[in-house]
Amino acid sequence: GYTGGSLNAITRSGSNQHKGSVFYFTRDQSLVGDGPEALGEPGEFSQDSYGFRLGGPISKDNIFYFVNAEIKSQDQPTGWSLSGNSGQCYGNCDPVISAAATRFENWLAQYNYNPGSRDENVRDIPADKAFLRFDFNVNDGNQLTLRWNYVDAGNVVNRPNSFTYEYPGEAYDFSSETNSLVGQLNSVFGTNMFNEFRLTFQQIRDRRPPVSIFPWVELEDVAPEAGYFGEFEAGSEPFSTRNALDQDIIELTNDFTWIKGNHTMTFGTSNQFFEFDNLFIQNAFGSYEFSNLEQLESGVAREWEYTVVNPGQPETQQFGINQIGLYA
């Protein structure tokens, strides 16, 4: 699902000394320890992460900067295959299961669709992050901070398991890009009063496209004659055919604190303004469910769905939510 929110994080900052560092981490299947034989050999995968940080003064004692960047790439196997070359083999590599898979794939080939390899699928999971911060000592009573945070992350989702074998072509690429900009002013008045003002703007763009374009096909009871009642699935994952969400969020917060003797009093306001643009059309390419191989090859679906937008209606829904808060 999706959610809207705002970002307020305590992070590193620069100082009067220039400091920096770089890093690199890596891991692959050769670093995986031995496990139960039933799990099979781990598929090929890789995890690489590298980046740097740098901070220091722009103007000594007055203006400081800090920048941080990280790039992460990860190739992660699903843990299941039909071929048995790596990971756990669906249906214990029973020849009856393999024969059923051949009939299923041949039926799909009639429509010029290849659902993907029988080998273990390796998913791509990238993540790029950047952070930039400036601190200004305006005067003895005021400090201004500007922060920018950026995240661009993806995740190819494909989840075969012991009951349902999802072919690689059923995967979808969930990606999320976030830009966040924060301005914060901390002020001190005398010895017993201070104020914190914060303005945040956040832009979030979520996308969920399928990796292949074809109606979703589910085959139940793939090999009942062998006592196996699992499922094959191929085609575009039905909830990802038309699925995207744009969020723009503005938050304005101000807290004034007054210390009087043994009492601390805070007066404030917190206000959030949300704008959403949501696209969700399930089964935009259609979906077909077949009870067994015979029904599949006869073209008799147990159930089918196809969703269209009413003529003249927009594909997306746009709406906003505002929250105003006062407290003491």
Question: Predicted regions: what is each one?
Answer:
Residues 1-8, 12-179, 191, 203-207, ...:
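Acidic, glycine-rich flexible loop segments
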